[in-house]
Amino acid sequence: MSLIDDTLEQIKAVDPALLAEAQVVLDNKTKPPGSLGRLEEFARRYVAIIADPENSDLELLGTKVVYTFAADHGVVEEGISLYPKEVTQQMVLNFLNGGAGVNVLARHVGAEVRVVDIGVDYYFGMVPGLVVRKVARGTANLAQGPAMTREQAVAALEVGIGLAAQAKKTGVTMLGTGEMGIGNTTPSSAIIAAISGKTVKEVTHRGTGINDAALENKIRVIEQGLAVNKPDPKDPIDVLAKVGGLEIAGIAGLILGAAANRIPVVVDGFISTAGALIASELNPHVKDYMFAAHESVEIGHSFMLQHIGLKPILDLQLRLGEGTGAALAMGLIEAGVKIYKEMATFAEAGVASE
C-alpha cells in the first residue's frame, strides 16, 4: 500500500460522542450555555480531534507550527503576476530571517514558522532553518501542458504527509498552512474551476493586484490551461498534477497527514484552501480536522470554503497568504481551548448553576 493510500485509510470522521463530551465540559463552566459563541465551537472541535482515549494525560496545548511551503510556477511566463518569480526565493530568505508578515503574526501568537522549499527554482545551498524537500525546480507552464507529472504531484503530497507525521512525534498539537509562490493564485483558481464546475471568471481575481487587462489575460490563461490539460474532476491528483502547484500539493499532504495523526490544522487563505480542497476530495473526513482561518478577498475562496463545508473564523480582507491568517486564527482557537481547560466550573467557583 502506498503512503497516500495508507494515510487516507487512517483518516476517520471525528467521533460525535467526543464532541458532545467536550460540550458538556463547556456547559459546566461559569457562564450561560453557549455564551462564548464560536470560541466554544473551536474548543469542542479541537478537543474532540486531539482526544486520545488511551492517554488521558495528553497535553492539549503543545507546540503550534505554521508550515510555509514555497515553490515556483512556470505559468508566470504568461504575465499573470505583478512580480517576477525571483521574489519567491527572496521571500524565502525573508521568512528565514523572521522579517515577513507570517513571522510577525506567528510570534504574536507564540507559533513557530517552518519554511519548506518544495519547489523553488533556485538552489539555496545550506541555509540554516530551511526545510529542503524540493520535488522539482518549479512547475511547467500549465497553459501549455501539465504543470507536473503525476509522480511529482504524489511526491509533493508525500512531503506534506511526512512533515505532519514528524510534527506529531515532536509534540506539535496545532498545525497551520502557509505558502509562497509567485503566480500561485492562477493554479488555485484552475483547481476550484476544475473541481467545482464554476467558470474561470467566477473564481479568478487580481492576486497581487493586477489591473483589468492583466486579469483578462489571467482568465484566458487559466481557460487555456483547462482546455489543454482536461483535468479529471473525479481524480483530485490528476487535477493537482495538471493545473496545480508543488506548494499546493505539499499543503494538501500536510492536511491529510494532520487528519491521519489527529492534529487540528488551521488552513490559511485562497492558495492554502486549494490544497485543502484537494485533500477533502481525496477523503471527505479531513474536513473534521480543518479550521478555516479566514475568508480572503479572492473571489474564488468563498466557493472553495462552501464546497468543502468550512466556515471561516475571520474576515479581515486579507490576501497576503504566507500563513498570516492561519497564525491569527491559531490564537483564537487556543483561546477557546484555554476556556475549556482553565475556566472554573460552577462547583469549583461555588456559583449556582440555576
UniProtKB/Swiss-Prot annotation:
Gene Ontology molecular functions: nicotinate-nucleotide-dimethylbenzimidazole phosphoribosyltransferase activity
Pfam family, one: DBI_PRT
EC number(s) from the headed UniProt entry: 2.4.2.21
GO biological process, alphabetically ordered: cobalamin biosynthetic process
Gene3D superfamilies: 1.10.1610.10, 3.40.50.10210
Keyword annotations: Cobalamin biosynthesis, Glycosyltransferase, Transferase
Pathway this chain belongs to: Nucleoside biosynthesis; alpha-ribazole biosynthesis; alpha-ribazole from 5,6-dimethylbenzimidazole: step 1/2
Catalytic center residues: E322
Catalytic activity: 5,6-dimethylbenzimidazole + nicotinate beta-D-ribonucleotide = alpha-ribazole 5'-phosphate + nicotinate + H(+)
Similarity comment text for this entry: Belongs to the CobT family.
Function: Catalyzes the synthesis of alpha-ribazole-5'-phosphate from nicotinate mononucleotide (NAMN) and 5,6-dimethylbenzimidazole (DMB).
HAMAP family assigned to the protein according to its UniProt record, in alphabetical order: CobT
Name of the protein this chain belongs to: Nicotinate-nucleotide--dimethylbenzimidazole phosphoribosyltransferase
Organism for this UniProt entry: Geotalea daltonii (strain DSM 22248 / JCM 15807 / FRC-32)
